[in-house]
Design a protein with these regions (language model features):
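Juxtamembrane/transmembrane-helix boundary motifs in multi-pass membrane proteins
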Residues: 4, 87, 91-99, 129
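Transmembrane alpha-helical segments and their cytosolic interface motifs
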Residues: 93-122
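Interfacial segments of alpha-helical transmembrane regions
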Residues: 133-139
Length: 145
C-alpha cells in the first residue's frame, strides 16, 4: 500500500467533500458523495490492488449521514486508516461509530448556535431599515449548508 498522499490530494478531498450531498438519497443518504470524494485517494492507496479498492469502495458506499461541514474530519481519519492497511471491519466500525456524533456536533455548532446568533444580530440591523441586515445571515446560512 505505501502511498504518498500529498497536500494536493488532501485539498482535492476537501473540495470534493463539498459535494457530499450531491447524490443524496433516502437509502444510503450521503454515501455516494462520500465515496466519490474519497475515490482519488483510495485509488492512490490501492494502486494495482483491484480487490482492495473494490472492498474499500463497497464499504464506503454503505449508509452514512453526517454533517457536511465536519465530514472532512471523518474522511481524514478513514484515509489514515486505509493508508496504514487497517482491517476493513475496524475502518467500517470507526465510520459507523463517528458519523452520528459528528453530525450532532455539527448541528449544534452550525444550526443551533451560529445561525441563530447571526439571525438575531442581522434582524436587528434589518428592523432598523439597514439593507445589509439580511446579507450576513444569508451568507452564513449558505456557507453552513
Amino acid at each position: 500500500m505505501g502511498s504518498e498522499i500529498s497536500k494536493k490530494d488532501i485539498t482535492r478531498l476537501g473540495f470534493r467533500s463539498s459535494l457530499l450531498q450531491a447524490s443524496f438519497n433516502y437509502e444510503r443518504m450521503q454515501a455516494g458523495g462520500f465515496t466519490w470524494a474519497m475515490l482519488p485517494i483510495l485509488r492512490k492507496i490501492y494502486k494495482d490492488d483491484k480487490a482492495g479498492l473494490s472492498a474499500a469502495m463497497k464499504d464506503h458506499l454503505e449508509f452514512i449521514n453526517t454533517h457536511p461541514n465536519l465530514v472532512g474530519f471523518l474522511m481524514g481519519l478513514l484515509i489514515s486508516m486505509e493508508e496504514k492497511g487497517e482491517n476493513r471491519d475496524t475502518i467500517k466500525g470507526l465510520k459507523v461509530a463517528l458519523f452520528g456524533p459528528i453530525a450532532g456536533i455539527g448541528d449544534a455548532i452550525f444550526w443551533f448556535t451560529l445561525l441563530p446568533i447571526m439571525a438575531g444580530i442581522c434582524s436587528s440591523f434589518a428592523s432598523q431599515g439597514n439593507i445589509l441586515g439580511p446579507i450576513p445571515v444569508s451568507y452564513t446560512h449558505l456557507r453552513a449548508h
